Design a protein with these regions (language model features):
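Conserved hydrophobic positions within beta-strands
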Residues: 36-38
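Short aromatic-glycine-enriched beta-strand elements
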Residues: 44-53
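A short macromolecule-binding patch
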Residues: 57-66
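Short nucleic-acid-contacting surface segments enriched for D/E, G, S/T with interspersed K/R
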Residues: 70-87
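OB-fold/S1-family single-stranded nucleic acid-binding modules
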Residues: 92-114
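Short boundary/loop segments of OB/S1/cold-shock single-stranded nucleic-acid-binding domains
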Residues: 17-32
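Positively charged n-region of N-terminal signal peptides that target proteins for export
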Residues: 1-4
């Protein structure tokens, strides 16, 4: 039983880590610069998330870890749903309506998220 558990952990942990840090799935050649309003925000780890409407579709937005956003002066109130934000980021290569944000400006403050 102990061997099975060790084998499971050895196989599962790298898979989870690779999925979590799959930044190569974003198209860094296609930079999106958007003026938007989030429709929802999740201030949580391992990364904050938000949703917004862009080109008539609902997009999932991947932010930075909460500790990094807070250390750089970003607060949940600054990006609350309905508030205007400017985003610079990359869309997914597979066409999924999701983008990874590199830079966010809210209430006149620009924050580098990566």
């Amino acid at each position: 039983m102990k061997r099975a558990l060790i084998l499971f952990a050895a196989l599962a942990i790298p898979t989870a880590a690779a999925g979590h840090h799959g930044w190569s799935s974003y198209d860094t050649e296609q930079v999106l610069r958007l003026d938007a309003r989030f429709t929802s925000v999740s201030w949580s780890n391992p990364h904050g998330h938000a949703t917004m409407t862009y080109r008539g579709k609902q997009w999932h937005v991947v932010l930075a870890p909460v500790a990094r956003m807070e250390a750089r002066g970003l607060t949940p109130a600054m990006i609350a749903p309905g508030k205007r934000v400017q985003l610079v980021g990359y869309p997914r290569k597979d066409g999924t309506t999701e983008m990874r944000i590199e830079r966010l400006t809210a209430e006149g403050k620009t924050v580098e998220l990566r």
